[in-house]
Each structure stands twice: as structure tokens, then as C-alpha cells.
């Protein structure tokens, strides 16, 4: 699972989910990628599940890059607890993903295989996504 090694503050405010991604909106490392179309919190378990779905489909052929990291703790109070007495304990780690953000990248496989592998990964994620190709710069 992906979690930070060390954090300055154990509990944080919830990040805003509004707006669009400022950076990380293009495929940089690989040839193909998954781009978010909606805002969402993606947990470390969802990231790992998507990674496994992709790597099992491409087998030994390609290379996978994960371009998001779950660096935000989300807290939760125990069930049937009265309100008050402080913020709950950290329950899971999330990455705050905004629309336009490329989350996974893939290279070294033919396009039909990449499209199917990324489609399987999209089913593991909590938002609508789309398949994107690397843009070729003409100079």
C-alpha cells in the first residue's frame, strides 16, 4: 500500500475537490494514460487495485507509472460515538484528484492491450475517466 513514511501533522483538513488540475494533465512518462473527468478522493487501496488490474492484463510486457500519491489522511470517528471530544483518528490515506489529472501511465505494449488494461483499471476507480494518448510535439 502507498502511504507517506513520515508526516508533519497526523490529522489535516479535508482538501477542496472543486476546480481543475493545474499540473499533471499530460502523458509524460508512458505512451498511454488514464485521465480523470470528475473530482474524487482516490484511496491507497483503489490505487493498488487498479495497478494490479493493469499489470495482470499486460503480464510481463509493459511498464506502469503511477503519477498520484495518497498524501492526505482522512479521519473517522468510531461508530456510535457521541459528538465532540476532538477529531477522529486517521482511517485511510487519499489522493485528491481533480478533473484533467493523469493518474496512471503505460508504455511498451500495443494500443489495444493498453486500452483494455487501462479500462480494467478505470473500473477500480471512484470517478469517470478516459483513455488518453501521448501528444506528439511537432517542431
From Swiss-Prot:
What's any one GO cellular component for it? cytosolic large ribosomal subunit
rRNA-binding: present as a keyword of the record?
A: yes
Composition bias, kind Basic residues: at what positions? 1-19
Alphabetized, the UniProt keywords read: Ribonucleoprotein, Ribosomal protein, RNA-binding, rRNA-binding, tRNA-binding
Query: What's any GO biological process attached to this entry?
Result: translation
Q: Where is the region Disordered?
A: 1-22
What stretches pass through the bilayer? none
What is a single Pfam family found in this protein's UniProt entry?
Ribosomal_L16
Ligase as UniProt keyword: no
What InterPro entries does the annotation carry?
Ribosomal_uL16, Ribosomal_uL16_bact-type, Ribosomal_uL16_CS, Ribosomal_uL16_dom, Ribosomal_uL16_sf
Q: Which GO terms describe its molecular function?
A: rRNA binding; structural constituent of ribosome; tRNA binding
Q: How does it assemble?
A: Part of the 50S ribosomal subunit.
Tell me the protein family, please: Belongs to the universal ribosomal protein uL16 family.
Q: Which HAMAP family match?
A: Ribosomal_uL16 (MF_01342)
What is the documented function of this protein? Binds 23S rRNA and is also seen to make contacts with the A and possibly P site tRNAs.
- Protein name in UniProt: Large ribosomal subunit protein uL16
Q: Which organism is it from?
A: Acidothermus cellulolyticus (strain ATCC 43068 / DSM 8971 / 11B)
Q: Which gene encodes it?
A: rplP
